[in-house]
């Protein structure tokens, strides 16, 4: 990794978060997800696709014990740096792992809350940026917008506590009927806990449980 952090920072609930040009920058969907989360200091939390780490750090600020993962090595390095930067503000802790979704979660590890802001933009092959950058990994949801979300839903039964809950972001640009099918096949109950419209797109935060 030879690209240095951008040194661009922002503040959220007292946390100082540094950004990086190879990492998805927190946007409206990030803050909407943060607003919807119900996490307490008793919770064991898993965040997939942590990016700059803002969601995991906010959960740790509330006192949760957090494991977060990201396929992007720049995100892993940056989240570790942001964790160290904000350590004195956190009542909980954060462990950062480099891997794709649940691939680095150990057998038997289960969580009270699982959180994911997935790549949800419907994307055809010709629309991909390509190259060595990480933009596609952060945004490409496949043709339906649900390629990665489907894998997330299918993995929950192995890692979510029976009385736990999972939160994820859904865009109205994606296929909601397919999402309903995936949730039904996984025997998950769902509700939309926060919904907002941005121009021609509606962003929903789903909360699901067994």
Annotate each predicted stretch with a short phrase.
Residues 28-130:
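Conserved SAM/SAH cofactor-binding pocket of Class I
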Residues 18, 23, 32-35, 146-205:
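Conserved Class I SAM-dependent methyltransferase catalytic core
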Residues 69, 142, 168-169:
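Active-site-adjacent beta-strand anchor residues
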Residues 206-210:
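C-terminal lobe and adjacent flexible extensions of AdoMet/dcAdoMet transferase-like proteins
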Residues 2-39:
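Class I SAM-dependent transferase core
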Residues 118-148:
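Mobile active-site "lid"/loop adjacent to the S-adenosyl-L-methionine
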